[in-house]
Amino acid sequence: MAKNGKKSKSLIASGIWCVVAVVVLFGYLGMVMGVPNMLNTIMKTAHDLLLNTVLYLMSICVITGAIGRVFVEFGVVALLERTLRPLMRPIFNLPGVTSLGAVMTFLSDNPAIISLAKDKRFASYFKKYQFISLTNFGTAFGMGLLVIVFMASQGYYAAPIIGLVGACCGCVCSTRLMQRFVLKAYPQYAVEDAVPKEETEEKEEESEKTEQTVFIRLLNAMLDGGRSGVDVGIAIIPGVLIISTFVMMFTFGPAADGTYNGAAYQGVELLPWLANKIDFVFEWLFGFHDPHLVAFPITALGAVGAALGLIPGFVSHGWIDGNAIAVFTAIGMCWSGFLSTHTAMLDSIGYRDLTPKAIMAHFCGGLVAAVTAHWMFALYLSLIHISEPTRQAEIS
């Protein structure tokens, strides 16, 4: 009886906080924009995002999903795994088989690392502290192919590659930091195996794909991969429509004449106003020359698909440059909505209590990724400027 009373009290308290938060949020927007304009802007922004951003992202998901499945079917993933394996131990302090997880999450999404972790033969290569850090390692490459292809579609090619290198640096920081946190909390995990040592008899099974022609294997791989891409595309719809809509309303301003008319992509410019107060921090760390750009990393904390939905608006306003694309690629890949997936991922492998440590480590990793990408892009620009006079002198 006492427990029920406590539970009902906590529910009442959380209900009050929820009502207060909703009233403050919509009250502030309605007070600045006007309630009819606010409602029209919410609906029109979400509708435009669905038609012009979500469907575009879904098409990329379908194509990249098909390519990824073809790579798996014809051994390209296995080849990449063999190539990357020697780098795992010295750089990430992880067994060589972990490289397969990097490739799989890069081609799909964060949870792909968990499907591998559930495989006991895969997990048998790890000590417990290494096994737990897999969530951070895999998340840093989540949806990497989608992010890079999307950025390249905006007309930038060198910047996404620099961002990929930055994401790798952030991954090293996040993974190593998580391992330190785990060992500090549970020193015994340094020697304990992730799963008990068991001798597994490998059964030689006649592979079905050897009985099929190359054309059928290619067709099946493309269709299955495309179907998985549709699933990813559908999964990002709530994040893009809900998170991006409200982030845009706190990022963009009124119409050109300074009034609100209920059109899409209007807002109160609260985030840029706050970012302006500490703009020197964002400019030095990330090279952001416009305070509106801070909306991308904030959104990427919860959903990278929603963060990508902000890019077309930034481009149309002229806020984007190569440096921003490099930083967005790095932080978008590294964070890739980890706040919405980390808890479930750690819970699925049985270490829910370590979620706060994993989140802290990965937050730091994302910052390292962004800062690294910014300074690498600055170095890239300086090298281009140095080489241009030399090239002109050679021509003359």
Sequence positions of predicted segments:
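Intrinsically disordered, low-complexity non-transmembrane regions of multi-pass membrane transporters
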Residues: M1-L11, F181-R227
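Transmembrane helical segments that form the transport core of multi-pass membrane transport proteins
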Residues: V35, T64, R69-E81, V214-A306
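Membrane-embedded helical hairpins/re-entrant loop segments and their flanking transmembrane helices
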Residues: I67-L100, K118-A123, F282
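Single conserved hydrophobic/aromatic residue that forms the stacking wall/gate
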Residues: I384-S396
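C-terminal transmembrane helix pair
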Residues: A112-L177, V304-L383
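Long, highly hydrophobic alpha-helical transmembrane signal-anchor segments
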Residues: F26-E73, L145-G163
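Hydrophobic core segments of alpha-helical transmembrane domains in multi-pass membrane transport
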Residues: W17-G30, C61-G68, G166-Q179, V240-T251, ...
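Alpha-helical transmembrane segments and their helix-start/interface "positive-inside/aromatic belt" motifs
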Residues: G5-C18, R227-G239, P356-A358
